[in-house]
UniProtKB/Swiss-Prot annotation:
Function: Confers resistance to blasticidin S antibiotic.
Domain N-acetyltransferase stretches: 1-136
E.C. designation(s): 2.3.1.-
Gene: bls
Gene Ontology BP terms: response to antibiotic
Name by which UniProt lists this protein: Blasticidin-S acetyltransferase
Keyword line: Acyltransferase, Antibiotic resistance, Transferase
GO MF annotation list: acyltransferase activity, transferring groups other than amino-acyl groups
InterPro entries for the chain: Acyl_CoA_acyltransferase, GNAT_dom
Classification of source organism: Bacteria, Bacillati, Actinomycetota, Actinomycetes, Kitasatosporales
SUPFAM superfamilies from the UniProt entry: Acyl-CoA N-acyltransferases (Nat)
């Protein structure tokens, strides 16, 4: 039975382009995270954060969350701007992408400069998944 590592090895052996790509430093995914805490409060409660990773000179936003009490004050925009700046400056990123569902935040991402690249209806059933991208 073939395993994923064995299948990748066979695929690499038969694809010079893929073999070369796998040997580049941009192939390795590197984490990128930014967080914000409330300015007031005794414990420095989390107000929001962004968790993503950088791969192939692109920032992949995996999760952006802002506490309900901090929404509407621009914190989400500041978090994503900070992550994009770090991605450009620290990793040489040329773009950013995010997947979001229709009940989440596609409008937010469009307001901060992302454009809709693809939509998949019924993924999962009854929900539309959106891929948004932005040049950095």
């Amino acid at each position: 039975m073939l395993s994923l590592p064995r299948l990748q090895t066979v695929n690499d052996e038969r694809s010079p382009a893929l073999r070369a790509l796998r040997r580049t430093p941009v192939m390795e995914a590197r984490p990128l995270e930014v967080y914000a805490t409330y300015a007031c409060g005794e414990r420095g409660e989390l107000a929001g954060g962004l968790v993503g990773h950088v791969q192939w000179q692109w920032l992949h936003v995996d999760l952006l969350w802002v506490d309900a009490g901090a929404r509407g004050a621009g914190l989400g925009s500041r978090l994503i701007a900070r992550a994009e700046a770090r991605a450009r400056e620290e990793f040489g990123c040329i773009g950013s992408q995010v997947e979001t569902w229709d009940f989440q935040a596609p409008g937010f991402y469009q307001r901060v400069g992302y454009r809709l690249a693809a939509s998949i209806p019924d993924y999962p059933p009854g929900i539309t998944s959106h891929l948004l991208v932005k040049e950095l």
